[in-house]
Amino acid sequence: MTEDRAHKVADEPAASGRQSPERKKRKWDQPAEDLVSAAVTAAAVSGMPVMNFGALPGVVLPGVTAYGAATLPSVVPVPYSLPPHIAPSVLQNAAAAAQKLSQAKIPDEVIAREIVINDADPSVRYKLTKRQTQEEIQKCTNTVIITRGKYHPPNLLPDGEKPLYLHISAGSQLKDTAERIKAVDRAASMIEEILKQGTTSESISVPFSSSTGQAVRPFSASVFLGFDADPSLNITARIRGPNDQYINHIMKETGVTVVLRGKDSENLGSCHSEASQQPLHLYLTSMHLKNLEAAKVLAENLLDTVAAEFGASRISSSKVYGAVPPPQQLLAGVDTSGTKSDVHYIVGPNVLSGATHSFASTGVIAPVVAPAVTVQSGAPTYSGVPLPSNMAYPIPPANGGAFYSGYGDIYPQATPLQQLAFTLKHASSSATQAVPVTSTPTSMATKGNSILDAEMDKRSRRKFQELPVSKGPATESQNSQQGSKFVKTGLDSSGNIGSSSIAPPKKVHPGSNGMLPQEEADMPSHLSISTKMLPPPLKSMLPLPPRSMPPPPPKSMPPPPPKFPSDEFLSRNENKFFPLKEPTAPPRSFDAISVLPSERRPREPKEEKNKRHTCV
């Protein structure tokens, strides 16, 4: 009976094992490695001596045969004490244990570091929390920097939350533990260096290293307070705002670093520097010029508001500019030696009255020259552009208003209404100052004046004006009335100039019929001075005549007869502008006598009439 029961008990576990499914193997089912064997293998790798574990009772090492205490000394070096058939297995176990120890991963929180920046200077705190600064440090050290915590002002009670700090951890690309620790330490040292430099005056001007390795200096600007305030008013706190909100607002809006510097600024960094001797101001720095300009506007508004609160008048830093120098191209031809010319540009009616000008035998005239013209190396220049030496054109002013000597008498400094009043005032005045004289050949000057007078006469004449027909020989007055076609040559006119005085200029007003008045017709057209603005010199001017010219014709020689358009030309113009007039027939009347012969009906023969009567 006992044997049967024993068979049943032995069969029950086998049956239960068949029925229950096999469980999956997990890593927790594997037995842990013996601590003693691990220590032995580690010691073997490091070369440390191993004790005689065979003499210890109850301690059995896997793969190691126990030897007596008499055969082994107390301390035996491993490479020389192990038998040849045991050494390979021990070395393999030691290598595996060393690999496991090297692969053991230390938690990131053990390597990571935290640097509190809550109590740092506002500019440094903003710089460290800026993403651009953090990315620069991350690229250099292969770390990850995160801003955490909450900013706690100095006068605010703690609320249980961590103050503002930077969390530094190693990057995922670093596998070795030693490299991860070194990277975190390097990033922490860079942040601590920035915190230390923030207490000095050079904290803001630390250059960033660009991708090319070159140092890039940021742009900077200073916005001064503009007035002296009483130290007892604590104006620094008004500029900073509660908890530095005003300065932080400018930094957040524009991304520019803002630092309050100068006297009574309470800035520890500027206590022993040159900035402490300057007036109170906001020092702005940025890597982008556009952001710096935007920050300057906000800083100006902030200081204007503070000045209004204290009732002080403030001069804006952006408005304190000196006189803007003129462009370099204008300085080339303008004489700015300090003497300012007051010559009026509007020529009055008595400019040359009563003055007799004698000319040399070469024959020259005296044109009007603007005071802005400076003669350099024998040639007049205006705004750096030399004029042709053979021209005698007067240079008109840039405008009719007053001129400012700081710009070399070029830029008008008056409104259009003031310029108009200035022009009318000096147009009616009769006294003007003398005008400089330049000498040019007579023929070219008279040709230029005759062309200008001809253009003015063409503007004043009507389109279909008829020229008067002179019965007698043409006089000099007729030549001046008939435009540029009848102007005398320059040689003829030069002879008259040398023996007569120049008459005062008069304004030309055409009469009702479009012709010049009789009293103005006595003066030749080439001696008339026009008060209107003259056009620029013509480029297509004829060359100078040769010196070997024939003598001028005698004065008694009559001028050439006037050239009138032919009948064919007049008829062509009439057909062009006027419709052709067809002859109209006289009015008809019902009387038979007034009917034209061509319109009368032909008479019928008498025979046809008789036939008609017979038929009826």
UniProtKB/Swiss-Prot annotation:
Compositional bias (Polar residues): 432-449, 475-484, 491-502
Gene Ontology annotations for the cellular component aspect, listed alphabetically: nucleus
Oligomeric form and interacting partners: Interacts with RS2.
Highest taxon above the source species: Eukaryota
Pro residues composition bias: residue spans: 534-564
One Pfam family of this chain: KH-I_KHDC4-BBP
SUPFAM superfamilies: Eukaryotic type KH-domain (KH-domain type I)
Provenance organism: Zea mays (Maize)
Protein name, per record: Protein RIK
Ranges for domain KH: 198-304
Tissue expression from the record: Expressed in vegetative tissues. More abundant in apices and young leaf primordia than in fully expanded leaf tissues.
